Amino acid sequence: MLCLGLMSGTSADGVDAVLARFQGAPDRPEWQLLSHHHSPYPAALRDELVRIGQGEPRPAAALLDLAEAVTEQQAIAARGADPDQRASLIGCHGQTLWHRPPSSTRRGASWQLLQAPLLAQLLVRPVVHDFRAADLALGGQGAPLVPRADAALIGPGDGWRGVLNLGGIANLTLIPPRWGPQKQEPVLGWDCGPANSLIDLAMEQFSDGQQLFDRDGAMAAAGRCDNDVIQRWLQEPYFQLSPPKSTGRECFGQEDLRRRLHELGSVERADAVATLTGFTAAVVAQDLDRLSADRSIHLLELLVAGGGCRNPVLMSELQRRCRGLAVRASDQIGLAAEAREALVFALLAWWHHRGHPGNAPAITGATRETCLGVRVDPA
């Protein structure tokens, strides 16, 4: 079956679309990535999404206009990846505006902006969307949803495999080995903390909006990382939580950056970016160290996807702080780094079609497995 996956992440830089073929057993499907297309958001749309995602209020009419604009951008990306309309089903994550994990006093909730009936009409094909809602209704975090799909797409290795996505947020998947005493362990996954979100916001601020990210890690490479500050930041409450846990720009956005820059004091801009880059790597390394100490899970390799894997300074920091762990881009095993999350949502749509569960209680904390997503057919 040919499926189209659409993903726009917390970086709000645009939409990734992939066309993929799936067949066979849902847990270990035969799959082929046929095309990948990235469609950037217009600058004004990206700016508005980032601001709202950090808590700036907007009237209902403006949010309605924004939902329509986001939906139209999804359709543009879909046509770029599938110009001949070969896909028979579309999986679309939508644009996350706000994510509220569950707490002891309040259920979780998450808002992915999308007008799914409009998208189905624009593309003249059924759309599966709202993937987080069912897991949240079962008491789960609603995210991350990628780990179970990672395990199906990549499969086990000779030891524990880690898959790290460095988008706006750093989220981690751990796939148990194919043999040995830990082969029956569940797939694990959680949001570690900020990946590119704080780095990107700092670059935009320091360049007066001219640079939206640290291309090739050039700014970080020119600065010095303050490890004393990083060690202090690592003691913050979110980084002390055990999984399941999830987060987003509502926690690691402009206000958080403002606080961290204030704590850094009057340092050079390059030093600030170097410290934020080192912080991203340190957050991941701390989680892996705890996993090793608490559960005797030792990774054989760490595959890195998302835009952050194109930042050589960040990759070097990961390699250094993870103390010799083999760190490499997911491209090296045939999983295109920038296409991975869109491929996941193509798979989740196929799973919905097959009635196969897409969440994993060991990852999200939901009370049980369930099929994810809501299907909308063209009128």
Regions from the PLM with identified roles:
Residues A12, A274, G278, D331-P378:
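Glycine-rich phosphate-binding/hydrolytic loop that grips phosphoryl groups
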Residues L299-Q319:
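Glycine-rich phosphate-binding loops at beta-strand->alpha-helix junctions
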Residues L2, P102-S110, Q121, R125-Q211, ...:
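Phosphate-binding/catalytic loop of phosphoryl-transfer enzymes
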Residues Q73-A81, R269-S296:
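Phosphate/ATP-binding catalytic cores across multiple sugar-kinase/actin-like superfamilies
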Residues G14-A20, G24-L33, H38-Y41, E185-A281, ...:
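Conserved ATP-utilizing enzyme core subdomain
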Residues M1-L34, S39, G159-R178:
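Gly/Thr-rich phosphate-binding beta-strand-loop-beta motif of the actin/hexokinase/Hsp70
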Residues G53-L114:
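Short beta-strand-loop/turn "lid" adjacent to the catalytic site in phosphate-handling enzymes
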Residues R86, L264, A272, D287-R295, ...:
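Non-transmembrane, aqueous-exposed alpha-helical and coiled segments at domain scale
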